[in-house]
């Protein structure tokens, strides 16, 4: 992520004392590239400021929302919180130092920062990318093993510790192979006195190319493969579950059409209500009545006392006092209200509505995951292609437009820090409610 001006001008910086002549021969004239972004410097300042503020505020909101409910956090939300933290580091370490080096054409932060800052830039970007891989792996595990025990907080801590360890290990060569080069010594101009460049000084081209290829594999190709495999598995699982429900609904419809008689024949074959209620009440109808709506009919007074209770002589007068769904059992002075039965048509309609909702959600998940993959691929591809091209054939980019092309590629990479809070936070149902509550609290305060 650091400004690799030296890659365009000198491919090999041998760390011996007799390299001044080689550097003078390798570097072009200072005026050839000095004014490459002069016409757009204010535009670049505004664009970098906008992207940096947007990325910083978005990731800060995600981090605050995750920390607000840290006692109820899941493994995915824990990883998303760490992703927001690493993206904040990317914004803080990459944007200001890169923009300053591009616009001022020199390194102004001292020799110690020349060794430290490229290392921190590389670690922050690499950790952010490795956390994306971890989120993809966790989602893949949840889809493939839904019945197994959920991942605990200890698994999240282990993943984060592994990610940061790998980040420090992979980027460890950068502090060693960076040095501060004086421009006066390099270009032989008195106007460039007291101006320095922070450049990579690898022992040979093979070391530099090997490091560039390793970063390409770890920071771009491997995450892209993991994201694609994980999200394809998620979409496939949702699609398989949806098709299974549709097939089961079609089978039920075929069984109903084949075995059930028509509504007209069923109405003709209906038995009278009183006869129906006199048949095996306990065996057939015990589940159709609600205990909450049971009521006891008043028993007639007088000579009927001490005898078996019977239904009043005029049951119509009693039934008129009850709800329309109530039934009177002959010979038993108790009334129950029948539970409403769901017809097969209503059940089918409910299942169809459920399938429609699942289809809508599956399309939403598919679009969101596809956009997530495309955002990562499009935002980081130009910068990695730029580094590979400048390592193998720097003549493809002219001296004057070198810094401008680099700024465009670098800004596209920085855009991922602005879009990650939206894709992983604001579109995440587990974090969306917390974000709304947090924004409301901030607005009220």
UniProtKB/Swiss-Prot annotation:
**Residue ranges that the UniProt entry lists as topological domain Cytoplasmic:** 64-77, 139-156, 230-368, 428-445
Q: Which CDD domains match?
A: 7tmA_NPY5R
Q: What would be one Pfam family of this protein?
A: 7tm_1
Q: Which GO terms describe its biological process?
A: cardiac left ventricle morphogenesis; chemical synaptic transmission; eating behavior; G protein-coupled receptor signaling pathway; generation of ovulation cycle rhythm; negative regulation of acute inflammatory response to antigenic stimulus; negative regulation of apoptotic process; negative regulation of glutamate secretion
- Which membrane topology describes this protein? Multi-pass membrane protein
Intracellular or extracellular location(s): Cell membrane
Matching PROSITE patterns, A to Z?
Answer: G_PROTEIN_RECEP_F1_2
The entry's cellular-component GO terms read: GABA-ergic synapse; membrane; neuron projection; plasma membrane; presynapse
Q: Which residues cross the membrane?
A: 43-63, 78-98, 118-138, 157-177, 209-229, 369-389, 407-427
The lineage's top-level taxon is Eukaryota
Q: Where is the lipid attached (S-palmitoyl cysteine)?
A: 441
Provide Extracellular-side residue ranges.
1-42, 99-117, 178-208, 390-406
Q: Tissue expression, per UniProt?
A: Brain; hypothalamus.
Q: What does this protein do?
A: Receptor for neuropeptide Y and peptide YY. The activity of this receptor is mediated by G proteins that inhibit adenylate cyclase activity. Seems to be associated with food intake. Could be involved in feeding disorders.
User: Which family is it part of?
Assistant: Belongs to the G-protein coupled receptor 1 family.
Q: What is this protein called?
A: Neuropeptide Y receptor type 5
- Give the lineage: Eukaryota, Metazoa, Chordata, Craniata, Vertebrata
């Amino acid at each position: 992520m650091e400004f690799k001006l030296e890659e365009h001008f000198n491919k090999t910086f041998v760390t011996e004392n007799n390299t001044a002549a080689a550097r003078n021969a390798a570097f072009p004239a200072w005026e050839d590239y000095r004014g490459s972004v002069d016409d757009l410097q204010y535009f670049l300042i505004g664009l970098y400021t906008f992207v940096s503020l947007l990325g910083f505020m978005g990731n800060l909101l995600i981090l605050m929302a995750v920390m607000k409910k840290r006692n109820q956090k899941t493994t995915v939300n824990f990883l998303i919180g760490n992703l927001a933290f690493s993206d904040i580091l990317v914004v803080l370490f990459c944007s200001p130092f890169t923009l300053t080096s591009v616009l001022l054409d020199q390194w102004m932060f001292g020799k110690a920062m020349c060794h430290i800052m490229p290392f921190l830039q590389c670690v922050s970007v690499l950790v952010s990318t490795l956390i994306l891989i971890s989120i993809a792996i966790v989602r893949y595990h949840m889809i493939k093993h839904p019945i197994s025990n959920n991942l605990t907080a200890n698994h999240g801590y282990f993943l984060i510790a592994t990610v940061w360890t790998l980040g420090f290990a992979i980027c460890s060569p950068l502090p060693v192979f960076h040095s501060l080069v004086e421009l006066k010594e390099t270009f032989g101009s008195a106007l460039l006195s007291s101006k320095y460049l922070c450049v990579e000084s690898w022992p040979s081209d093979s070391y530099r190319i090997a490091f560039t290829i390793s970063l390409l594999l770890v920071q771009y190709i491997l995450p892209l493969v993991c994201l694609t495999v994980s999200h394809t598995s998620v979409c496939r699982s949702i699609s398989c579950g949806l098709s299974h429900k549709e097939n089961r609904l079609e089978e039920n419809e075929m069984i109903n059409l084949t075995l059930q008689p028509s509504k007209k024949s069923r109405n003709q074959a209906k038995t009278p209500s009183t006869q129906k209620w006199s048949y095996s009440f306990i065996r057939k109808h015990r589940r159709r009545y609600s205990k909450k709506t049971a009521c006891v009919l008043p028993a007639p007074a007088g000579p009927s006392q001490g005898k078996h209770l019977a239904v009043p002589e005029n049951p119509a007068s009693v039934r008129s006092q009850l709800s329309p769904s109530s039934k009177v059992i002959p010979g038993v002075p108790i009334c129950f209200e029948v539970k409403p039965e769901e017809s097969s048509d209503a059940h089918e309609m409910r299942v169809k509505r459920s399938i429609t909702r699942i289809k809508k959600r599956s399309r939403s998940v598919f679009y969101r995951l596809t956009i997530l993959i495309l955002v990562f691929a499009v935002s980081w591809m130009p910068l990695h292609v730029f580094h590979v091209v400048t390592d193998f054939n720097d003549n493809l980019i002219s001296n004057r437009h070198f810094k401008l092309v680099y700024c465009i590629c670098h800004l596209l990479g920085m855009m991922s820090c602005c879009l990650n809070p939206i894709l992983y936070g604001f579109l995440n149902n587990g974090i969306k409610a917390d974000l709304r509550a947090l924004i409301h609290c901030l607005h009220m305060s």
